[in-house]
Amino acid sequence: MIETATDVETSPSPLVSAHPAWSCRWCSSQHGVRVLDAGLQSPSDLHPRPSDPAPDPEYPLVMVMCLDCHLVQLESDPTTPEEPRGLEPSALVEQAEAAIKDAEADGYLRPGMRVLEYPSPHGGSWVEQLGRRSLVEVSEGPADLLVDIFGMMHDADQRAALTSRVSQMSPDAILLMQFHTVAAIVRTGFWNALRHGHFAYYSTPVLVRMAAELGLTAITAREYPLYGGTIVLALAKTGSRWGDQGEGVTSLIESEIADGVLEPEAVASLNDSLARSAAGLKRYVSEAKSRSETVAGYSAASRASALIRCGGVTAHDLVAVADASVGLHGRTMPGSRIPIVSPDDLVSARPDKVLLFVPDLLNEVRQALPEIEQNGGRWVLLDPMPREIDSTVSD
């Protein structure tokens, strides 16, 4: 029998030291503790074909906090790097537009500036929008503006990654780093932000300190609602014309420290979030099944795989998971082998409930698939507990 998070007690447990072979991805310290253990999980971008041999490969998925620099990070990752999956959610496009407008208002954008972008496999690129403002994309420095959109977290060697970015900056350059802050991850119980291929999880105080070690000063920080709390931090070389650390940065640092982002015990509350959300998912689909309701899912993202695995949900519970990426159609979710289908196939199935594994997609999918609610179905957000959304269709 596979143990699932539904079997796990939610009472606090003593923190366990990181694996003896672990060393910090920033400071090389070997003093760390495990703050989240998601058990065995498949690689983040694995979507096997129905005919592929089973069982699917699984590896430990563990989050560690360094006790010296407090960087939250992936303990180990034997998987291969993930690859982009194509379609870009509108939530990421909207986030890019909002952040670019703010960067423009802060004086960081000028026509003719040389821009170097460090993208991630998840989309959210700023290149097109910056091009419309007459900024010039380059493939190497020195650059006047460097943009990192959830990019550096994919680098196993964090010090080398940030050092490389600093080396590409002109004397008065700005480095804009967008990241899903640990404060939001803990506050919202977003434990399944943890995944193979995501080597680092930043809090604002830790990232500001990392940057300072390499001669950078945090000038401004802006917060956005994406993923429950996304930060865009503006960094400049210390002593440049941009001046000292901004008051907004200092205020955000103080706020996040008060939230406990430097305290392993506070971050370890994610284990309770995992247990509650996994149990809640299993209970929800079991109750729906007892009412003879058809339940499906939407978004074959890695966070969905982790939640399905921890909840012990199978193809007997979910008839399918729909995804807009054509390359995933005909494949399955790892471990559970739940079929991945097209949005059109989801509509044809006429599900009573559709579990939305990425809540930020709600407005987008409701607009794209009005038939779900028109046919009497309901969207159910997993954020992280199941929450049914009232239908927009009038009786």
Language model features: what each stretch is:
Residues A54-P142, G189-W191, R195, E263-R291:
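Extended interfacial segments that mediate partner engagement and assembly in macromolecular machines
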Residues A143-D157, P359:
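A short SAM/SAH-binding and catalytic strip from SAM-dependent methyltransferases
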Residues A160-I174, P370:
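A short glycine-rich, Lys/Arg-flanked "PGG" loop and its adjoining helix->strand segment in the class I
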Residues I2-E3, D7-E94, R222:
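N-terminal juxtadomain amphipathic helix
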Residues G124-V127, Y284-R366, N375:
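A solvent-exposed beta-alpha-beta segment
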Residues L46, M177-A200, T204-V206:
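Short, glycine-/aromatic-enriched active-site segment of Class I SAM-dependent methyltransferases
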Residues G228-S273:
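Flexible, glycine-/basic-rich loop-and-beta segments that form/coincide
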Residues D172-H180, R378-P384:
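Conserved beta-strand signature within the Rossmann-like core of class I S-adenosyl-L-methionine
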